[in-house]
Structures are given as C-alpha cells and as structure tokens.
Amino acid sequence: MAQLETRTEPMVVNFGPHHPSMHGVLRLVVTLDGENVIDCEPVIGYLHRGMEKIAENRTNVMYVPYVSRMDYAAGMFYEAIVVNAPERLANIPVPKRASYIRVLMLELNRIANHLLWLGPFLADVGAQTPFFYIFREREMIYDLWEAATGQRLINNNFFRIGGVACDLPYGWLEKCIDFCDWFGPKIDEYEKLITNNPIFKKRIEGLGTIQRDQAINWSLSGPMLRASGVSWDLRKVDSYECYDDFDWQIASEKEGDCYARYRVRVEEMRQSLSIIRQACKMIPGGPTENLEAQRMVTEDKKSEIFGIDYQYVAKKVAPTFKIPNGELYTRLESGKGEIGVFIQGNNEVTPWRFKIRAADLNNLQILPHILKGAKIADIMAILGSIDVIMGSVDR
C-alpha cells in the first residue's frame, strides 16, 4: 500500500510594523513551516530621523534636548554620553558632587527602564496584573525627575559639559531615600508574584537561548550579555563617573534564555537601589541649602567647601564652546547595554562627525538567529526579552 507524502509550503507572515507587541515600528518578515519559524528578517528604519546629522549641525548645548527622544526610556543615559564625549576630548573636569548627581539620575533611569521593560514583557506572555503595578513606581521616579529637572519622562535637558544644569533642590535627597525605602519591598512583591510562578516559568524558560560564545560574537551587551554568563558591566570595567566609590555587584546568570534575562534585570534594579542609597549618603556637601549655608558662614576662603568637588558644574560652558581637534570613542552602561559615541572635532562649535552606538540595535541583530526553530507564539516573548526601543534603533 503506497504511503501518501504530506508536503507543506512555507508561509510568509508580516508582523508589524504597527503592532502592540512590536515595541515600536518594527516589521518582522517571518517564514513559517506550520507553526515553526524557519526564517525571520527584521525590517528597520521606519523611525529614522537623522540624529547623527543633526548633531553635526548643532552645538552641544543645543543638541542635548534632542537625544532623550531617541530612547524615551533611557533619556538620561543619552544625555550623559552626549556630554561625556566632548568632556573627555577637551579634558574638562567634573566636580565630585556633579558626578554623584549624575549617578543618581542614571540609576533612577536604569530602574525606570527596567520597569518599563518588565510590564509590557509580562503582558506579552499573558500576565496582565504586574503591568499596572510598574507604573506606580515609575510615577515616583518621574516626580523625582520633575523636582530636579522640571520635566518628567523626556527632555530633562539636565546634563551639561562639566557637570549638570543645576543643583538638587532642598529635600530632594530625602525624597530619593524615601523612594528607595518604598521600592525595595516592591521588588520582593514582584518576585513573589512572578519569579516562581509555574505558568510564567513554563512559558519562557528555555526560550531564545544564547550561548556565551554567541553573545560575545554578536557584540551583545547589557542584560543580554550578562544573562549568558558574561559578567561584563561598563560601570565596573571603565569606572566612569564615580562608580568606584560604591559597593555593588554585577548581576549575571548562566542559562542565557528569556527567564535568565528577566532575572538579571530584576537583580539590576536591586543593585541600582543600593547605589542610590550610597550616593545619597556620600554625596559631597549634602542637601543644597546646608551646603550654601556652610559657604556663607565659612570665613576661611580656603575651606574645602569652596573647592571644585562641592560644585555642581566645573565651569559654565559658553554656547561658543569649540570641540577641539581629535577623535575618541566613549561609552557607558545603559539599561539596555553599551551605548557609545564616536566624536571627531575640528576646533569648531559643532562636531565634524558624531556617530552613535545604540545598544538595542546590536542586540536586535541576533533575533533571526534565536527565532529559528521557535514556535510562532514564542516570537513576542523572545523579542520582548531583548528590550528594544525603535527610536534608538533607527535614530
């Protein structure tokens, strides 16, 4: 008796570019064999706005407000890297107090970034409840930003060459510590609700596994790299700002799957809380009004309270500040991974070349590789675990 052969033809399906699970205007051209993914081609560029070319036609002071719109979940990180590049090229010192203020803002942004990742990721895999919890804590971070910078989510325009735009308002550090006291138990609450949930674990464990060598060869960074067993964090490696002053650990896992990436991000929020607590206690000068009062009553003009480390900016940079001749690449660790800037100056007020390295663009490149062999229902979970914001991918 002759056996019948079953032939299946591949089917091409378009995901996006306008879909709630695409995390922006990302289009995936997916080739399916039944429910199995056999190929995937990401199509990017829908949100390209020419940010690098804009940088080459703006002074640094004019360009800082632009960059928080690239990645609305990591605005402070992009502000920091945009001022760090000319600072290092021109050897401009940063006061210790300003560096501590920067660290406070960056770590608050890291927590906000991971919270904004956590809620939609859980919604993608079917857990709706925590999606509403994370915005409660994010609002508290927005309130802290609003008190210090005047803006909430984006366009904080707070970082400056040589420091920050203004000092922290009186009472801000106490409010920041209050937030830490509130948020610490909330992370425990998230973990009780999510981490050992059998449905959640069964849904994402073993999905999108990336081996250690693959993570290195694909130039992954951030939680994507650390979840594959590579303890690499630029805050430890490059020791930029004042991270060497604090006692904290690199969060890493070995499994390399979606669940490991979740565990890394949750642990990073705990470590960021620890850094914020230490920075609030160790910041030179303490609360602003106390610092100003000490300056007024100090008769000895040589007192350290008048030193550079107690200022919030080394020197107000003029709009005519010229970027010196030379080139360099500088980088920092954002919530998504390594973001960097290659700057080339020619002694003009605008840079001759300003190349931006976005962490999520590099991390997104491995998506077709880890999707092959997965089920169509797992595409959203794997994509969600990468954490992409298309504004910074396309720039």
Curated annotation (Swiss-Prot):
It is found in: Cellular thylakoid membrane. InterPro entries: NADH_Q_OxRdtase_suD (IPR001135), NADH_UbQ_OxRdtase_49kDa_CS (IPR014029), NDH1_su_D/H (IPR022885), NiFe-Hase_large (IPR029014). GO terms for molecular function: NAD binding; oxidoreductase activity, acting on NAD(P)H, quinone or similar compound as acceptor; quinone binding. It comes from the Bacteria. GO terms for biological process: photosynthesis, light reaction. It catalyses: a plastoquinone + NADH + (n+1) H(+)(in) = a plastoquinol + NAD(+) + n H(+)(out); a plastoquinone + NADPH + (n+1) H(+)(in) = a plastoquinol + NADP(+) + n H(+)(out). Pfam families: Complex1_49kDa. Keywords: Membrane, NAD, NADP, Plastoquinone, Quinone, Thylakoid, Translocase, Transport. Its EC number is 7.1.1.-. GO terms for cellular component: plasma membrane-derived thylakoid membrane. It is a peripheral membrane protein. Belongs to the complex I 49 kDa subunit family. NDH-1 can be composed of about 15 different subunits; different subcomplexes with different compositions have been identified which probably have different functions. NDH-1 shuttles electrons from an unknown electron donor, via FMN and iron-sulfur (Fe-S) centers, to quinones in the respiratory and/or the photosynthetic chain. The immediate electron acceptor for the enzyme in this species is believed to be plastoquinone. Couples the redox reaction to proton translocation, and thus conserves the redox energy in a proton gradient. Cyanobacterial NDH-1 also plays a role in inorganic carbon-concentration. This is NAD(P)H-quinone oxidoreductase subunit H.
